[in-house]
Amino acid sequence: MANNTTSALHPRGSGQRCVYDTVLRFGDPDARRRGFQLDEVSHNKLCDIFDSGPLHFAFGDLKVMKVAGGVVTPHKTVVKTVYVSGVQEGNDYVTFAFTPGPNEWREVDPRIDKRTALVGVLVQEHKKLDSDLKESRRELSQLKLEHSLLRHDYERLVREKPGPAMRTFKFSAVIFYAFFLGFLLMSAVKGEVYGRCLDSELNLNGNPEVCLHWEEVKSFSLQVALADFWNMTLDYYATVAPQSPLMDLALGYFPYFANWHMAAFLVGTAHVVAAERPLYMLVTLVLATLSRFQLVALAAVPMLDMPSSIGLWVTMVLFAIDQAFAILASVLISVLLLILCLAMNDVDYGALLRGCVTLVSATVFSHLVSFLHAPGWFTIIAILIYRIPKVLSYVSAERVDIKGPDGKIKETQNANPSWITKMSGLKNFFQRAFRQKVRTGVNPTTRIIPNSLVVIDAKDGRGTGFRVRNYLVTAGHVVGADTTVRVRWADVTSFAHVVYRVPNKDIVLLTLPAEYNSLHSYKLAKEVVDGTVVVVSNGDGGALSVGISEGVIVGESMTYAINTADGMSGSPLTTTDGRLIGVHQQNTGFTGGAVIFRDTDFPQPKKPQREADLEAKVAELEKALAAYTQSATGEDIVGLVRVAIQREMEVLRKELSNEFGQAKGKTKHKRRIMAAARSGGKRKPGKVWTEEEYKKLLEEGFTRDQLREMAEAAREADDDFDDYEEEKNEVDYPVWSDHDSDEEIDRDWFGQNLPTWSSAWSDFEPELDPDVTKTLPCHLEDKFSLKHYIITEADLKHFGQEMKEYMDHLDAVIKTHTEKGKWCPNTNTEEILKDLNAMWFKLNHTMWKNGVAPFMQRKKQKPKNGKRAPKGAQ
């Protein structure tokens, strides 16, 4: 029999049992044994139906058509057969029953067995992952082989690669460069001498016909004056300075640095050697030499765009012919360019306007230089006077941000290039070695969930989505009016339908495709508060883009400053621990905003009308029943009696107080003090924070000792406030309340006689607080100030001087040693608190000694706003 149960189940058609089915053996053992026996005579085998996974065997009834004498009758016969259930490939749960007659397994309505379904799905998933793993390994092996071959080819090509070849120059560039050099030499050897004629024979116009005798003069008086000053300076230096051949050589060649021909030669040669298209600069240098623009043209080049550069070329050609007409032509060309280029955007049009102004200014300045015969150094000084103030702001800056027309920063350049340090690889060495930063706070860590975002493709654009519960959430403007959008997660693409649009919010909920069941689901934040927020979106190349900023709540939105990008709409806005706050919406290039997503924004299930009517009826009946059962139980009656007795006792005590002027009796606060004395002065402290608040404070950076001090200070503030709340309703007599024990009743009614006045007054003698070192700086005024007590004229008459000295000392301590509710650095807090406590005790003891109730025995006045200081304040 054992041999008959080894029929094929895994792999398909192999004749081997699946190991999971062999071990688990779900179902009826007898049905399992009978099923394998029937499988031997069946035309289709179980191994062909179920490729893997456990099977569930069970007996069941099956209705088959009755066949008599080869004729099918309309009556059905119920036979007992075997049902086999399992999970097929594709995670489909099916059930097959053995049908006698045809002797085959036929599919019937599934009979669900949870264990078989769960294990079967896991087996199918394991099989799929195992297949994917094998395929990935094959691909990895193939890629490694291809990489090895490519590496071999690369090494071979590197060995065969020739060395760096000398750069080849274009023939046109070489010819034009030679022409440029010849033009420079021709212009340099041109001799022009200015002089004054000495002949006395004049023609009819008053000018000499032929000048045989003349003397050289210089038309620029400033040049003569500066030359004389320079020569005098050199002569004086030569007489007092030590002789240096290098100094003489430098001073001899210094004038050549202000020569145009030398500057043009250096600039032209540099462009021919290094520039890809040197002809543009060579043309500019030739025209500048021809027209005598010279250094003015070279200084104007950085501020010219393409239209104004062409205008400069035309103007220089005209300047060589007629300077006055060239000035007029520069103005006309500038006006024409400004009119023809009105269709440009603001940025390009601004650059054109700057180029036109530079063109006209360069033409006018060149005319003045030519008219005055100014030397080259004069032009250089004038250009430096213009350029240096313009770039002073750039020189003092550490970096320069280059922005585009949309306001976004396109590029950031370092204003301190430090080329030698950069090329030496020593960047920021000394800063890293010697600069130490002081930690000013604790930066929170951020929890980022990888592979948790999907890409939403709609007709109106593209955005980001994420999963919350069994929905995909994104921004409403991403989906637009579409009802179906395409969703892409990693390499899986599917379609999702719009399920719900949140009213008054730009949020849309989509269906979750079956392929995305393993997508991580975000959890909602427990509370939405101002603080650090995190925006996670899909970046370029499939990487995650994470932005961290400080968020501020504005209504049902949260705004924050972050550098957003296109396609971020619909991204999740989370807390630092990954809890969802809202859905990212806005994109202005710098600021961002999100709509807060709450639990109430999910679609609420609609209740059937019958259920709603029943709930309303039940509520109505409960309301009516409450009226009938009012004060029907013994507890209710006892409560009513207690309230009535309490009311009568209050009236009686008020009457006794008004009639006899009896002083205050024992208050609840006094009773609590007496109880504490009987119990040894120990009082079990109550909890100030919940466990969740305590952990949150620890995460924010507070130590356990600091939290302990904060808790004790908060308990002291609670005790003071409770005393005020208990005493504020007393009218010359304490409010009646039940006694806590029989011992307290015996002590109040049958105790010892009342003490004498002297012994009673001695009981109220102030005591020095032994430990005040735990008092926080923000509680100094509340603990030691006299502003919270009622001070009578008699108090001022007898103790005014002591009170003034005490308050002046307290104000001086608060102003000198505290700042914004915190101790100032290097402050000896223990000595200050002991000093204040000693002065407080001295003042109260003086009042008690003179028969006046000290402030320790008086109650504080309630603050105007009726609120206490927050717990745990520092």
Swiss-Prot record:
EC identifiers of the protein: 3.4.21.-
Reaction catalysis annotation: RNA(n) + a ribonucleoside 5'-triphosphate = RNA(n+1) + diphosphate
Top-level taxonomic group: Viruses
Molecular function per GO: 5'-3' RNA polymerase activity; serine-type peptidase activity
The organism of origin for this protein: Mink astrovirus 1 (MAstV-1)
Annotated spans, Disordered: 855-874
Spans traversing the lipid bilayer: 249-269, 279-299, 324-344, 365-385
Record PTM O-(5'-phospho-RNA)-tyrosine, positions in chain: 694
InterPro entries: Astro_1A, Peptidase_S1_PA, Peptidase_S1_PA_chymotrypsin
Pfam families: Astro_1A, Trypsin_2
GO biological process: proteolysis; viral translational frameshifting
Residues at the active site: 477, 506, 569
PTMs per UniProt: Cleaved by the viral and host proteases. The protease is probably autocatalytically cleaved.
Gene3D superfamilies recorded: Trypsin-like serine proteases
Protein name per the record: Non-structural polyprotein 1A
Entry's Gene Ontology cellular component terms: host cell membrane; membrane
Site feature (Cleavage) residues: 195-196, 436-437, 662-663, 665-666, 752-753
Key words of the record: Covalent protein-RNA linkage, Host membrane, Hydrolase, Membrane, Phosphoprotein, Protease, Serine protease, Transmembrane, Transmembrane helix, Viral RNA replication
Compositionally biased tracts (Basic residues): 857-874
Family: Belongs to the astroviridae polyprotein 1A family.
